[in-house]
Amino acid sequence: MANSKRTLFLKRRLRVRNKLRKVNAGRLRLSVHRSNKNISAQLIDDVRGVTLAAASTMEKDLGVVGKNNVEAAKKVGAAIAERAKKAGVEEAYFDRGGFLFHGKVKALADAAREGGLKI
């Protein structure tokens, strides 16, 4: 099967990331990964190749009860915004990575915005 779900997802992720790189060269990237059980976010400096801040539902200190729901995504978004402030970051661009900007991904982005991170 040439166009399996995985292949289509990888094509979509590359298409999204390439468009974002053209427009946002030199800016920090807020990358989101969503799995069946967890959701995570990283603040990445692509120029230096360094992760400045990260947050995930796998961390015990976030106190997430249900790891894969909208409420958990909101907590991860708030945590990444707080850690970005500690790292001295105020602005980044949002890399949804091939996931639809809906539900958990949207909740994470909204919580990061409410936390003071400009996306």
From Swiss-Prot:
One GO CC annotation = cytosolic large ribosomal subunit
Q: Supply the alphabetized keyword list.
A: Ribonucleoprotein, Ribosomal protein, RNA-binding, rRNA-binding
Q: Which Pfam families match?
A: Ribosomal_L18p
Mention one GO biological process in which this protein takes part, according to its record. Answer: translation
> One GO molecular-function annotation for this sequence?
5S rRNA binding
S-adenosyl-L-methionine listed as a keyword? no
Q: Which Gene3D superfamilies match?
A: 3.30.420.100
Which family does the UniProt entry place this protein in?
Belongs to the universal ribosomal protein uL18 family.
Q: How does it assemble?
A: Part of the 50S ribosomal subunit; part of the 5S rRNA/L5/L18/L25 subcomplex. Contacts the 5S and 23S rRNAs.
The job of this chain, per UniProt, is described as: This is one of the proteins that bind and probably mediate the attachment of the 5S RNA into the large ribosomal subunit, where it forms part of the central protuberance.
In Swiss-Prot or TrEMBL terms, this protein is called Large ribosomal subunit protein uL18
